[in-house]
UniProtKB/Swiss-Prot annotation:
Disulfide bonds: none annotated. This is Large ribosomal subunit protein bL17. Residues 119-159 are annotated as: Disordered. Residues 143-159 have a biased composition (Acidic residues). Keywords: Ribonucleoprotein, Ribosomal protein. GO terms for cellular component: cytosolic large ribosomal subunit. Residues 119-138 have a biased composition (Low complexity). The keyword Ribonucleoprotein applies. Belongs to the bacterial ribosomal protein bL17 family. The lineage of its organism: Bacteria, Bacillati, Actinomycetota, Actinomycetes, Micrococcales. Part of the 50S ribosomal subunit. Contacts protein L32. Pfam families: Ribosomal_L17 (PF01196). GO terms for biological process: translation. One of its GO terms (molecular function) is structural constituent of ribosome.
Amino acid sequence: MPQPTKGPRLGGGPAHERLMLANLAAALFAHKSIKTTETKAKRLRPYAERLITFAKRGDLHARRRVLAVIGDKTVVHELFTEIAPLLAEREGGYTRITKLGFRKGDNAPMAQIELVLEPVTPKAKPAKSTAKAAPKSKAPVEETPDEPASEETAEAEAD
């Protein structure tokens, strides 16, 4: 028999939490950015990224699985046709959470969660062969200073 998750839930029961996360995900996909509490944003992030991964697959089964969660055909269509192609090259990290401070009234910590729609720029990897080709010498070459010899000759002349 499956055991329910332990610990506090958003909104009370597990069904309410599922519905709340589905509504937050639908709002995120519709508006590309939403303002909510930090706790809700942190719980929404893996949920939304999983739905985006389904949308990147783009097949009928993935569309039906996302539709079973969100339920709004227009939002699902926008996710599959507009958002998923923009995130096709990205391998994860589709969302960004920015802390905004505290809400007036109940002092709840607020955050903005948004989709990262900027194109991915591949990082330049340093060439390993050039790093190995020029090994550093372990023993530094020390030059003999000329000044101590001149001081000795100056002392010898003074005597």
